[in-house]
Amino acid sequence: MGVIRDSWYKMARFGMGFRNRAEGGQGTSGKPMTGSRETKFPPKFSAWRRIVVKLSGEALMGALTHGLDQDTLARIAADLKEVAARGVEAAVVVGGGNFFRGIEGADKGIERARADSIGMLATVMNALALEYAIEKQGQAARTLSALPMPALCEAYSRQAALHHLGKGRIVVLAGGTGNPFFTTDTGAALRGAELSCDLIMKATQVDGVYSADPKRDPAATRYDRLTHDEAIARNLAVMDTAAFALARENGIPIIVFSITQPGAILAALEGRGKATLVSPS
Protein backbone atom coordinates (compact mmCIF):
# COMPACT_ATOMS: atom_id res chain seq x y z
CA MET A 1 0.00 0.00 0.00
CA GLY A 2 3.10 2.27 -0.08
CA VAL A 3 2.48 5.79 1.17
CA ILE A 4 -0.87 4.75 2.56
CA ARG A 5 0.89 3.28 5.56
CA ASP A 6 1.87 6.57 7.19
CA SER A 7 1.57 7.10 10.93
CA TRP A 8 -1.79 8.91 10.72
CA TYR A 9 -3.24 6.11 8.65
CA LYS A 10 -2.07 3.52 11.17
CA MET A 11 -3.69 5.41 14.02
CA ALA A 12 -7.03 5.59 12.25
CA ARG A 13 -6.95 2.11 10.75
CA PHE A 14 -5.45 0.15 13.62
CA GLY A 15 -5.84 2.39 16.66
CA MET A 16 -2.07 2.72 17.19
CA GLY A 17 -1.20 5.61 19.51
CA PHE A 18 -4.66 6.99 18.87
CA ARG A 19 -6.01 7.81 22.30
CA ASN A 20 -3.22 10.07 23.50
CA ARG A 21 -3.10 12.24 20.38
CA ALA A 22 -6.62 13.66 20.55
CA GLU A 23 -7.06 17.40 20.91
CA GLY A 24 -8.00 18.20 24.48
CA GLY A 25 -8.36 14.45 25.04
CA GLN A 26 -8.01 12.20 28.03
CA GLY A 27 -4.98 10.27 26.83
CA THR A 28 -5.22 6.66 27.84
CA SER A 29 -7.85 7.17 30.54
CA GLY A 30 -10.44 5.31 28.51
CA LYS A 31 -12.82 8.27 28.20
CA PRO A 32 -14.08 9.36 24.78
CA MET A 33 -12.64 12.59 23.43
CA THR A 34 -15.06 15.51 23.36
CA GLY A 35 -14.85 19.13 22.40
CA SER A 36 -15.94 21.86 20.04
CA ARG A 37 -12.70 22.30 18.09
CA GLU A 38 -12.18 20.99 14.60
CA THR A 39 -11.22 17.34 14.54
CA LYS A 40 -7.83 16.65 12.97
CA PHE A 41 -7.85 13.65 10.65
CA PRO A 42 -5.18 12.24 8.33
CA PRO A 43 -4.21 15.16 6.07
CA LYS A 44 -3.29 13.16 2.98
CA PHE A 45 -5.65 11.60 0.47
CA SER A 46 -3.11 8.76 0.24
CA ALA A 47 -4.40 7.63 3.63
CA TRP A 48 -7.69 6.63 2.03
CA ARG A 49 -7.28 4.53 -1.07
CA ARG A 50 -10.88 3.30 -1.22
CA ILE A 51 -13.91 4.54 0.72
CA VAL A 52 -17.58 3.79 1.10
CA VAL A 53 -19.93 6.72 1.73
CA LYS A 54 -23.29 6.10 3.39
CA LEU A 55 -25.95 8.59 2.24
CA SER A 56 -29.37 8.48 3.83
CA GLY A 57 -32.43 9.10 1.71
CA GLU A 58 -33.13 12.16 3.85
CA ALA A 59 -29.77 13.62 2.77
CA LEU A 60 -31.11 13.78 -0.80
CA MET A 61 -34.28 15.71 0.11
CA GLY A 62 -32.69 19.09 0.72
CA ALA A 63 -35.40 21.34 2.14
CA LEU A 64 -38.19 19.12 0.81
CA THR A 65 -40.33 16.92 3.04
CA HIS A 66 -39.93 13.90 0.76
CA GLY A 67 -38.57 12.90 -2.63
CA LEU A 68 -35.44 14.23 -4.33
CA ASP A 69 -34.06 17.75 -4.45
CA GLN A 70 -32.17 18.23 -7.70
CA ASP A 71 -29.89 20.96 -6.35
CA THR A 72 -28.88 18.72 -3.46
CA LEU A 73 -28.22 15.82 -5.81
CA ALA A 74 -26.04 18.06 -8.00
CA ARG A 75 -24.11 19.35 -4.98
CA ILE A 76 -23.36 15.86 -3.65
CA ALA A 77 -22.52 14.60 -7.14
CA ALA A 78 -20.03 17.45 -7.64
CA ASP A 79 -18.43 16.62 -4.29
CA LEU A 80 -18.08 12.95 -5.22
CA LYS A 81 -16.53 13.95 -8.54
CA GLU A 82 -13.85 15.94 -6.69
CA VAL A 83 -13.12 12.95 -4.46
CA ALA A 84 -12.68 10.70 -7.50
CA ALA A 85 -10.48 13.33 -9.18
CA ARG A 86 -8.02 12.93 -6.32
CA GLY A 87 -7.61 9.24 -7.04
CA VAL A 88 -9.82 7.94 -4.24
CA GLU A 89 -12.04 5.01 -5.24
CA ALA A 90 -15.54 5.72 -3.94
CA ALA A 91 -18.57 3.50 -3.42
CA VAL A 92 -21.81 5.07 -2.20
CA VAL A 93 -24.52 3.21 -0.30
CA VAL A 94 -27.85 5.04 -0.46
CA GLY A 95 -30.83 4.75 1.84
CA GLY A 96 -34.46 5.16 0.86
CA GLY A 97 -36.07 7.04 3.74
CA ASN A 98 -37.07 9.98 1.56
CA PHE A 99 -39.56 7.65 -0.12
CA PHE A 100 -40.24 4.78 2.27
CA ARG A 101 -38.75 3.39 5.48
CA GLY A 102 -39.31 -0.28 6.13
CA ILE A 103 -39.51 0.01 9.90
CA GLU A 104 -42.11 2.78 9.63
CA GLY A 105 -44.13 0.69 7.22
CA ALA A 106 -44.02 -2.18 9.69
CA ASP A 107 -45.25 0.15 12.43
CA LYS A 108 -48.27 0.89 10.23
CA GLY A 109 -49.19 -2.76 9.84
CA ILE A 110 -47.19 -3.97 6.85
CA GLU A 111 -45.39 -7.25 7.44
CA ARG A 112 -41.79 -6.31 8.31
CA ALA A 113 -40.13 -8.40 5.61
CA ARG A 114 -42.43 -6.94 2.98
CA ALA A 115 -41.98 -3.40 4.32
CA ASP A 116 -38.20 -3.78 4.15
CA SER A 117 -38.49 -5.01 0.57
CA ILE A 118 -40.40 -1.85 -0.33
CA GLY A 119 -37.71 0.19 1.38
CA MET A 120 -35.04 -1.57 -0.67
CA LEU A 121 -36.89 -0.59 -3.84
CA ALA A 122 -36.78 3.03 -2.66
CA THR A 123 -32.98 2.83 -2.47
CA VAL A 124 -32.87 1.83 -6.13
CA MET A 125 -34.76 4.98 -7.10
CA ASN A 126 -32.28 7.09 -5.16
CA ALA A 127 -29.29 5.25 -6.61
CA LEU A 128 -30.43 5.78 -10.19
CA ALA A 129 -31.03 9.47 -9.50
CA LEU A 130 -27.60 9.88 -7.92
CA GLU A 131 -25.90 7.95 -10.73
CA TYR A 132 -27.48 10.32 -13.26
CA ALA A 133 -26.47 13.39 -11.25
CA ILE A 134 -22.87 12.15 -11.08
CA GLU A 135 -22.78 11.47 -14.81
CA LYS A 136 -24.11 14.99 -15.47
CA GLN A 137 -20.98 16.24 -13.71
CA GLY A 138 -18.88 14.40 -16.29
CA GLN A 139 -17.86 11.63 -13.89
CA ALA A 140 -18.46 7.97 -14.77
CA ALA A 141 -20.70 6.07 -12.36
CA ARG A 142 -22.43 2.71 -12.15
CA THR A 143 -25.40 1.58 -10.07
CA LEU A 144 -25.19 -1.95 -8.71
CA SER A 145 -28.23 -3.38 -6.94
CA ALA A 146 -28.38 -6.18 -4.40
CA LEU A 147 -31.85 -6.80 -5.83
CA PRO A 148 -31.37 -7.95 -9.45
CA MET A 149 -33.09 -5.50 -11.81
CA PRO A 150 -31.41 -6.05 -15.18
CA ALA A 151 -33.66 -3.59 -17.00
CA LEU A 152 -32.49 -0.77 -14.72
CA CYS A 153 -28.97 -1.50 -13.49
CA GLU A 154 -26.36 -4.18 -12.94
CA ALA A 155 -26.78 -6.78 -10.23
CA TYR A 156 -24.33 -6.35 -7.39
CA SER A 157 -21.34 -8.63 -7.13
CA ARG A 158 -18.03 -8.00 -5.44
CA GLN A 159 -16.21 -8.62 -8.71
CA ALA A 160 -18.35 -6.10 -10.62
CA ALA A 161 -17.94 -3.45 -7.93
CA LEU A 162 -14.16 -3.85 -7.80
CA HIS A 163 -13.99 -3.76 -11.60
CA HIS A 164 -15.83 -0.45 -11.81
CA LEU A 165 -13.89 1.06 -8.92
CA GLY A 166 -10.65 0.06 -10.62
CA LYS A 167 -11.81 1.88 -13.76
CA GLY A 168 -12.27 5.10 -11.80
CA ARG A 169 -16.07 4.93 -11.73
CA ILE A 170 -18.09 5.89 -8.70
CA VAL A 171 -20.11 2.84 -7.69
CA VAL A 172 -23.60 3.56 -6.34
CA LEU A 173 -24.86 0.62 -4.29
CA ALA A 174 -28.61 0.04 -4.05
CA GLY A 175 -30.83 -2.52 -2.38
CA GLY A 176 -29.09 -2.52 0.99
CA THR A 177 -27.86 -6.01 1.78
CA GLY A 178 -30.61 -7.53 -0.35
CA ASN A 179 -32.23 -8.98 2.77
CA PRO A 180 -34.91 -7.68 5.15
CA PHE A 181 -34.18 -6.77 8.77
CA PHE A 182 -30.84 -5.13 7.90
CA THR A 183 -30.37 -1.37 7.72
CA THR A 184 -28.49 0.42 4.99
CA ASP A 185 -25.94 1.39 7.67
CA THR A 186 -25.22 -2.31 8.07
CA GLY A 187 -25.15 -2.58 4.28
CA ALA A 188 -22.49 0.15 4.16
CA ALA A 189 -20.36 -1.64 6.74
CA LEU A 190 -20.81 -4.93 4.89
CA ARG A 191 -19.79 -3.44 1.55
CA GLY A 192 -16.91 -1.63 3.23
CA ALA A 193 -15.54 -4.93 4.49
CA GLU A 194 -16.34 -6.85 1.32
CA LEU A 195 -14.66 -4.28 -0.94
CA SER A 196 -11.62 -3.85 1.34
CA CYS A 197 -12.37 -0.18 1.94
CA ASP A 198 -10.03 1.86 4.12
CA LEU A 199 -12.79 4.08 5.49
CA ILE A 200 -16.55 4.30 6.00
CA MET A 201 -17.99 7.81 5.76
CA LYS A 202 -21.37 8.24 7.41
CA ALA A 203 -23.06 11.39 6.08
CA THR A 204 -25.62 12.84 8.49
CA GLN A 205 -27.48 16.07 9.24
CA VAL A 206 -25.21 16.87 12.23
CA ASP A 207 -21.45 17.34 12.51
CA GLY A 208 -20.53 14.11 14.25
CA VAL A 209 -21.55 11.71 17.00
CA TYR A 210 -23.28 13.19 20.04
CA SER A 211 -24.12 11.80 23.47
CA ALA A 212 -27.79 12.49 22.65
CA ASP A 213 -29.80 13.96 19.80
CA PRO A 214 -28.50 17.55 19.63
CA LYS A 215 -31.74 18.69 17.99
CA ARG A 216 -33.67 17.58 21.08
CA ASP A 217 -31.09 17.95 23.83
CA PRO A 218 -29.12 21.23 23.87
CA ALA A 219 -26.78 19.73 26.48
CA ALA A 220 -25.68 16.93 24.13
CA THR A 221 -21.90 16.58 23.84
CA ARG A 222 -20.12 15.99 20.55
CA TYR A 223 -17.36 13.40 20.54
CA ASP A 224 -14.20 14.17 18.58
CA ARG A 225 -13.06 10.56 18.69
CA LEU A 226 -14.42 7.22 19.87
CA THR A 227 -13.57 3.58 19.50
CA HIS A 228 -15.99 1.10 18.00
CA ASP A 229 -16.34 -0.53 21.42
CA GLU A 230 -17.27 2.79 23.03
CA ALA A 231 -19.86 3.55 20.36
CA ILE A 232 -21.45 0.13 20.88
CA ALA A 233 -21.33 0.26 24.68
CA ARG A 234 -22.94 3.70 24.76
CA ASN A 235 -25.59 2.66 22.22
CA LEU A 236 -24.92 5.78 20.18
CA ALA A 237 -27.72 5.90 17.64
CA VAL A 238 -25.84 7.48 14.73
CA MET A 239 -25.34 3.95 13.35
CA ASP A 240 -26.84 0.66 14.43
CA THR A 241 -24.90 -1.81 16.54
CA ALA A 242 -24.52 -4.33 13.72
CA ALA A 243 -22.81 -1.71 11.54
CA PHE A 244 -20.40 -0.69 14.30
CA ALA A 245 -19.66 -4.36 15.04
CA LEU A 246 -18.91 -5.16 11.40
CA ALA A 247 -16.57 -2.18 11.16
CA ARG A 248 -14.85 -3.20 14.39
CA GLU A 249 -14.37 -6.80 13.34
CA ASN A 250 -12.79 -5.69 10.07
CA GLY A 251 -10.72 -2.83 11.48
CA ILE A 252 -12.41 -0.12 9.41
CA PRO A 253 -12.52 3.43 10.83
CA ILE A 254 -15.68 5.51 10.44
CA ILE A 255 -15.93 9.26 9.95
CA VAL A 256 -19.32 10.73 10.90
CA PHE A 257 -19.86 14.18 9.40
CA SER A 258 -22.51 16.62 8.20
CA ILE A 259 -23.46 16.47 4.51
CA THR A 260 -25.42 19.73 4.57
CA GLN A 261 -22.72 22.00 3.12
CA PRO A 262 -21.08 22.01 -0.34
CA GLY A 263 -17.84 20.06 -0.43
CA ALA A 264 -18.62 18.21 2.79
CA ILE A 265 -17.28 14.81 1.71
CA LEU A 266 -14.05 16.31 0.42
CA ALA A 267 -13.65 18.41 3.57
CA ALA A 268 -14.05 15.37 5.82
CA LEU A 269 -11.43 13.47 3.83
CA GLU A 270 -9.02 16.40 4.13
CA GLY A 271 -9.64 16.71 7.85
CA ARG A 272 -11.34 20.10 7.64
CA GLY A 273 -14.29 21.07 9.81
CA LYS A 274 -16.00 19.19 12.61
CA ALA A 275 -16.64 15.46 12.56
CA THR A 276 -16.22 12.36 14.69
CA LEU A 277 -13.67 9.65 13.98
CA VAL A 278 -14.64 6.18 15.25
CA SER A 279 -11.60 3.92 15.19
CA PRO A 280 -10.71 0.35 16.10
CA SER A 281 -9.70 -0.08 19.74
What are these regions (language model features)?
Residues I4, A12-F18, T34-S281:
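C-terminal catalytic "cap/lid" subdomain
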Residues E23-G25:
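Short Gly/Ser/Thr- and charged-rich N-terminal loops/segments
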